[in-house]
Amino acid sequence: MDIGKKHVIPKSQYRRKRREFFHNEDREENLNQHQDKQNIDNTTSKKADKQIHKDSIDKHERFKNSLSSHLEQRNRDVNENKAEESKSNQGSKSAYNKDHYLTDDVSKKQNSLDSVDQDTEKSKYYEQNTEATLSTNSTDKVESTDMRKLSSDKNKVGHEEQHVLSKPSEHDKETRIDFESSRTDSDSSMQTEKIKKDSSDGNKSSNLKSEVISDKSNSVPILSESDDEVNNQKPLTLPEEQKLKRQQSQNEQTKTYTYGDSEQNDKSNHENDLSHHTPSISDDKDYVMREDHIVDDNPDNDINTPSLSKIDDDRKLDEKIHVEDKHKQNADSSETVGYQSQSSASHRSTEKRNMAINDHDKLNGQKPNTKTSANNNQKKATSKLNKGRATNNNYSAILKKFWMMYWPKLVILMGIIILIVILNAIFNNVNKNDRMNDNNDADAQKYTTTMKNANNAVKSVVTVENETSKDSSLPKDKASQDEVGSGVVYKKSGDTLYIVTNAHVVGDKENQKITFSNNKSVVGKVLGKDKWSDLAVVKATSSDSSVKEIAIGDSNNLVLGEPILVVGNPLGVDFKGTVTEGIISGLNRNVPIDFDKDNKYDMLMKAFQIDASVNPGNSGGAVVNREGKLIGVVAAKISMPNVENMSFAIPVNEVQKIVKELETKGKIDYPDVGVKMKNIASLNSFERQAVKLLGKVKNGVVVDQVDNNGLADQSGLKKGDVITELDGKLLEDDLRFRQIIFSHKDDLKSITAKIYRDGKEKEINIKLK
């Protein structure tokens, strides 16, 4: 950097010296301003701060002038020192060493006295303020800190100065400055300590002081440490360097152990301040390397930036020296005692300096570093995330370790649990199946009982074969055919079998072929038959023990919808023992039957309706309930187009009454009143007028003929009488009249009839015997 008068220094050295100069000057001004205006509000303080920045340009000019004067004086001192060295080299080696030592000692003590005088003047100046102690200690601390900074950078600066002085740069700026004043303040504390140390030696102290006074009058030139290093290219002597390190170690030890927390707070505050004014500066070396290529003469940056970087660099240097001097504390314990009072003073000055820095920052109105706060929040969030990840990793490691230690036991435990679940499911399924099987068994038991009873019924049903000329099944069929039917063994006495069947099955033949379920056949004899009930009894003899008589049930307790089985031999022997299933479809049915095949119904048969399959050959077969008991005998079936499963059976209670008479008598005696009748529904209009029928009479019978001396004649019936009621029951036709009369075949008592004669209603009693 060219600062005029052919003085050239490196950019980095120029900037560093400029920062140090501005830092020391601004620190003194700010401390004084704080003491004078501590009771003024923030507005006034901000105005004062702005005035300081306005004066920074003047400071910049003063620095250049001071530095220029200093460099001129240094060149003169260098030339004089070279001349003295050439003279001293001509003498003896011992004399040269003595003179050189005395010269250095005298120059150093002269600087010490000058610094003492300057300190005295400063102390008088600061006593005028209300808090002189605070300002003095803060200034001493700053000066000692600057001295340590300069001593740490002296090697780098010396080489750079020597190199740049020989080769000036074309782009450097011209600056004139007197650096002597700034160096005097920075070296005063070190020289004062040396004088105090020498004064304790007694006589040696007085002699040295006199020499210093005499040399001072002669104006012996004093070289600073940096100048001496530039000329001689040698560091400080070993005793001086050791004393300097001891003093710095004692100060750092007191600061570190007593006010560690305050320094950490100050460091965080200055780091926040640094983020407002300058980019991040890691150390002085990197900063100098950047400054070698960038020239920045902004006064504001030079005022604010050095104070922050200076404090950071001082702390780094103090920490380094503190670590190095810990190993020397035992050897230097005696000397350390002498510096305890000075350490206490340094501690107090450090505390006051920190307070002053904080007040200065408040006066400057610096805003908090929001970027640093954001970075701190981001760091906290990152640390929480890392802790969460670490926790998860710890859990994973614990689980993995647990698995590696106990995996065989865990596998066995899991297998046991799975086995228990499977067995439980199996047992539940088995129990469910058992319950279902129980229900099925109950149904199966019933069904098995039914089948057992059906099998027994099959053993009681036989085939009855007879040749007949006509088929009496409904509908009427005039074609002659071989009649094949079924019969039921209702009674067995020894080897004698009593079989009930239909009258139209046996026909007119006395002997019938009886075939059993085991295909054995015998010839049976007809004991009796009744065409009005369509029942017949056949007697047969057989020693076959497989033939069983059937159990008799009760037809009076039949229930609509009751399950039934029909056992018979449809279509003959080839399909004997056929069992069909159905229900009772109807009760108390009156079925018209044509026995003589003259296309005129002869009788109303009282029966119950079933829907089981009945085919030709089932006539005379058994109708049994679920218990296998006989409840009826198949009698008829309606054979008409579009009609299915409409069959009828004679109730077993009626069958029992008839078969008893057929066994003993061979026939059934019915009462005969001796009349012939016509149905009113079949009369034409002339016949209706002849009998003088009223319009309201729709149903009934008209007496067409009366036998002489018959029961009807004896009862008073006449031809032309219209009977509408008999025995309290309405008459629909002549079949119903015969049915009511035959129903009294057992008691033969007289019954009341309601008649119309000559259009007049009348009642008469009809005799049945």
UniProtKB/Swiss-Prot annotation:
UniProt-listed Enzyme Commission number(s): 3.4.21.-
Q: Does the keyword Hydrolase apply?
A: yes
Q: What Gene3D superfamilies does the annotation carry?
A: 2.30.42.10, Trypsin-like serine proteases
Pfam families named in the record? PDZ_2, Trypsin_2
Q: Which GO terms describe its cellular component?
A: plasma membrane
Q: Where is this region: Disordered?
A: 1-388
Which keywords does this chain's UniProt record carry? Cell membrane, Hydrolase, Membrane, Protease, Serine protease, Transmembrane, Transmembrane helix
Subcellular location field: Cell membrane
Q: How does it sit in the membrane?
A: Single-pass membrane protein
Q: Which family does it belong to?
A: Belongs to the peptidase S1C family.
Name of protein: Serine protease HtrA-like
Q: Which organism is it from?
A: Staphylococcus aureus (strain MRSA252)
Q: What is the lineage of its organism?
A: Bacteria, Bacillati, Bacillota, Bacilli, Bacillales
